């Protein structure tokens, strides 16, 4: 800009908007208080339903979950999709945080 006052002619709008990918491959860990709250809700619902859930009840609660981890041997990215209940995916999470490791197809073929 030149002069004491800016004018419309002094402002150059030559920048074009660029597309930005808003996808993120990172998953946020829920806080312990959220986990406790969810677990309390699950416990109270289980206490209300003392009888065994039917196969149809289990199918209603099934969901697909994506698991992204690294191969224990070559450290390449391994993606899995599992179909289970929220309770089961918590158990899988605990196992993966412990001693359970995933092996990629290439390393599995040579093992």
UniProtKB/Swiss-Prot annotation:
GO terms for biological process: DNA-templated transcription; symbiont-mediated perturbation of host cell cycle G1/S transition checkpoint; symbiont-mediated suppression of host innate immune response; symbiont-mediated suppression of host type I interferon-mediated signaling pathway. A motif (Nuclear export signal) lies at residues 89-97. Highly phosphorylated. One of its GO terms (molecular function) is DNA-binding transcription factor activity. Residues 29-38 have a biased composition (Acidic residues). A motif (LXCXE motif) lies at residues 22-26. This is Protein E7. It comes from Human papillomavirus 7.
